[in-house]
Amino acid sequence: MAAQETQATQQSSVSNGEVSSNGAAASGQVAQTGATAQDPQQQQQQQPSAWQVIKGVLFRIFIIWAISSWFRRGPSTPDPNTPAGAPRVPSRNLFPKDTLMDLYVYISQSEIFTDFNNTEELFWYQQDLVYGEWTTGDSGDGCYEYYKELDLSESVKQNGSIYMHIYFTKSGFHPDPKRKGQYRRLSTVHATRMLNKYKRRKFLKTKNLLTGETEADPEMIKRAESHGPVEIISHWHPNLTINMVDDHTAWVKGSVPPPLDQHVKFDAVSGDYYPIVYFNDYWNLQKDYYPINDTLLNLPLRLTYCPLSLWRWQLYAAQSARSPWNFLGEDTYEQSDEDQDSVKVALLETNPYLLGLTIVVSIVHSIFEFLAFKNDIQFWNSRQSLEGLSVRSIIFGVFQSLVVLLYILDNETNFVVQVSVFIGLLIDFWKITKVMDVRLDRENRIAGIVPRLVFKDKSTYVESSTKIYDDMAFKYLSWLLYPLFGCYAVYSLLYVEHKGWYSWVLSMLYGFLLTFGFITMTPQLFINYKMKSVAHLPWRMLTYKALNTFIDDLFAFVIKMPMMYRIGCLRDDVVFFIYLYQRWIYRVDPNRVNEFGTSGVDHSKDSSAQPAAGETPAAITEKPEGEKKND
């Protein structure tokens, strides 16, 4: 179970849009046509976990819910800028239903287009489109398609931009304002879109620390030296859909809910709004983008015009909305390209019933996570005795959380993941104060200035046999862990490239904990075996975590996942089944007195019989010390 948390962190930590020194694109980088291919092992590690995909879907559902809540608001408040605070008047669509339209599509390197007489820049001209018509077109669904290859200029090869300017005009009109009698402002809808997409490619300069050699592509090293560690590269996708929303809602200026307000354009004079034009590239997978470079002679472009209903437009607008966490800084909470692709592929390829079941189960999974966290805090907060509990496992958990935090900081993971791991580390530190006596020694200061922290085992841990069994368990465990740790360190040093010695230490420790961290759960099993008791364990928390592990098992084999993640789920199951077996063979004796001096029989007597008024209750017979030891 602890190993799964580090695995999920690893999935997040590699999604930074980086390129490793061997020239392979990392999680945020798309595959290049004719360029170097990604390492298969790296591709396997980059696949996001099931819950990253599911949580991405749930986050989008939340955005959709927020938008729909805006539609359920009351009437708009009066605008103080209007005379006497009069309420704003609802507007209408400037293009009525079934309006005949002409479509003009111009391709230019200029963001502001004025050269309407240049026929070479007219990419597509489509006459007699019917606004809101769903039965015409090439396939009888209201859609029209056009394909053509664009000549690639030298400026575009050198990271220049390509813009598409589209104009919808009522039939018989022209988009050129200079054509008197053929142009009308209220009969022309204009929208501009940059066709190429700029992606950041970060070069990680790594090498073998012993030999100093690297498997990096010499071309990548040369580009890194000339452009720096971060390079902005123009990418291209050959498909784009132009949607005109079939909507005649009486929108009120200033009251359109976000993110829809970005697309509804009002005329300043009449107050009415233009038809909503939406460039739909949602189903363009990031892996299908390829870089624009000197090897390309032309760029293929397939444009599709389709009508779009209001509710589907709301869904797309919510999907493309900027994250509310952007105020924390760029890329704070933005999903990586592969995370976004995983959500889309799940929607496209997953059976609808399975997808619905996945969403429901993921909600249950989140509830179990919260309940496990709550019961874990309650257990340690109210715990009076440490008898039967492995204190060393708690201390090792702090070390493990610290390594994970330093690792994700070294790999520049996004801010939200860093905060979540840091909070987990603080909770682990808090557990230390519950299992050990922590105090400040102001007499023996460090360098005579800083008070020294003193850690001392609690008496309930030292005076019982638990400490002996705990030390014995970690002694046996060290016989296995130290050789494995040494072998893994040598392997990482010989065969894996690193940025430096500090990164090697962190990645080596992190990889070792990810692979063998589950072994640290076994000392508690040994203590249970020696004490012949499991009554001291936080069973509620363990049960919730086990249920989550079983859910992970189910979807790890249903959803495409890395094999190491599947193995991690299964090995955690093995440990928990051993816990269940111990609970079955070491049944709780109701006559056994716990650390509070009460037993199950006492509670049953208290509930069935109450002493009479003025009668002194019978004293509780103290159990022998040998019987208390197992509680």
From Swiss-Prot:
Q: Which InterPro entries match?
A: CLPTM1
Q: Where is the composition biased (Basic and acidic residues)?
A: 622-631
**Main location class:** membrane
Where, in residue ranges, is this chain on the Extracellular side?
1-352, 410-414, 497-500
Which residues are on the Cytoplasmic side of the membrane?
374-388, 436-475, 522-631
A biological process (GO) of this protein is: cell differentiation
Q: What keywords is this UniProt entry annotated with?
A: Developmental protein, Differentiation, Glycoprotein, Membrane, Transmembrane, Transmembrane helix
Which residues lie within the region annotated Disordered? 1-47, 599-631
What is the membrane topology noted in the UniProt record heading this document? Multi-pass membrane protein
Cite a GO CC annotation: endomembrane system
What family is it from?
Belongs to the CLPTM1 family.
What is this protein's function per UniProt? Involved in GABAergic but not glutamatergic transmission. Binds and traps GABAA receptors in the endoplasmic reticulum (ER). Modulates postsynaptic GABAergic transmission, and therefore inhibitory neurotransmission, by reducing the plasma membrane expression of these receptors. Altered GABAergic signaling is one among many causes of cleft palate. Might function as a lipid scramblase, translocating lipids in membranes from one leaflet to the other one.
Protein name, as recorded: Putative lipid scramblase CLPTM1
Where does this protein come from, organism-wise? Answer: Danio rerio
Q: Which gene encodes it?
A: clptm1
